[in-house]
Amino acid sequence: MNSGVLLSESETDTSETSERQSGLLSAQGSIKGKLEEFSAKLDRLRLDDENSEEEHALKSQSVSVNSEGNISRSASASASASASASAKLRNSQSPVQEYTSDTNPETDASFRVKIRLRPIGSIPQIQPRVCQISSHQNFSALVKFLCKRLKRNHVHCYINNAFAPSLNQTIGDLWSQFKTNDELIVSYCETVAFG
């Protein structure tokens, strides 16, 4: 009777051992699958070839799963892999950080745009020829300024002698699209100059 109990305990021990081994095998398969998936993701994320030595070290290192289900890597290989991953992360983030940290004068509310005023025809020249206006103001503010300065009821204005912008368009948008030597060239006249 005693041997029967011992036999059943040994049977449970072997069944537990076989369950552990099958669990380890499935864990090894899932770990191996995860490692392959991670490797494929890293291959897709390769952004530049500057770190080719680090990438070569990452490819040449061997990752093994031992019988206990633990992942073993040499310490230097894991350090080089983490250094490579952090370098890639820094390289991929740096253009975004530089772009967002740069101040864009066109979006700055206090940015002032230089405007060069050129007369067309017999209309008098305004002195000084270059003035500054806030970039968030509409083009109508410039037209009103010219009307007051020239003492006229109406003035026709053109950008780069090419087109008449709408009065509600912002000066900053016009400057960013049509600037010449960081100045917006505005031609003005009494009558319609360009049909």
UniProtKB/Swiss-Prot annotation:
The UniProt keywords, alphabetically, are: Autophagy, Isopeptide bond, Membrane, Protein transport, Transport, Ubl conjugation pathway
Give the disruption phenotype, in one or two sentences: Impairs the formation of preautophagosomal structures.
Name a GO CC annotation attached to this entry: Atg12-Atg5-Atg16 complex
In what way does this protein cross or attach to the membrane?
Answer: Peripheral membrane protein
Which ranges are annotated Polar residues under compositional bias? 20-29, 59-71, 89-105
InterPro entries noted in UniProt: Atg12 (IPR007242), Ubiquitin-like_domsf (IPR029071)
Give the compositionally biased regions (Basic and acidic residues): 46-58
A GO molecular-function descriptor: Atg8-family ligase activity
Crosslink (Glycyl lysine isopeptide (Gly-Lys) (interchain with K-145 in ATG5)) position:
195
Q: Where in the cell is it found?
A: Preautophagosomal structure membrane
Q: Where is this region: Disordered?
A: 1-29, 46-71, 86-105
Q: Name one GO biological process term.
A: autophagy of mitochondrion
Membership in a protein family = Belongs to the ATG12 family.
Q: How does it assemble?
A: Forms a conjugate with ATG5. Forms a thioester bond with the 'Cys-116' of ATG10. Interacts with the ATG7 C-terminal 40 amino acids domain. The ATG12-ATG5 conjugate forms a complex with several units of ATG16. The ATG12-ATG5 conjugate also associates with ATG3.
Protein's job: Ubiquitin-like protein involved in cytoplasm to vacuole transport (Cvt), autophagy vesicles formation, mitophagy, and nucleophagy. Conjugation with ATG5 through a ubiquitin-like conjugating system involving also ATG7 as an E1-like activating enzyme and ATG10 as an E2-like conjugating enzyme, is essential for its function. The ATG12-ATG5 conjugate acts as an E3-like enzyme which is required for lipidation of ATG8 and ATG8 association to the vesicle membranes. ATG12-ATG5 rearranges the ATG3 catalytic center and enhances its E2 activity.
State the remark under miscellaneous: Kluyveromyces marxianus proteins are shorter in length and have a more ordered secondary structure than their S.cerevisiae counterparts, which might contribute to the superior thermotolerance and solubility. K.marxianus could be therefore useful as a new model organism for further elucidation of the molecular details of autophagy.
The record's annotation in PANTHER family points to: AUTOPHAGY PROTEIN 12, UBIQUITIN-LIKE PROTEIN ATG12
Name of protein: Ubiquitin-like protein ATG12
> What organism is recorded for this protein?
Kluyveromyces marxianus (strain DMKU3-1042 / BCC 29191 / NBRC 104275)
What gene does the UniProt entry assign to this protein?
ATG12
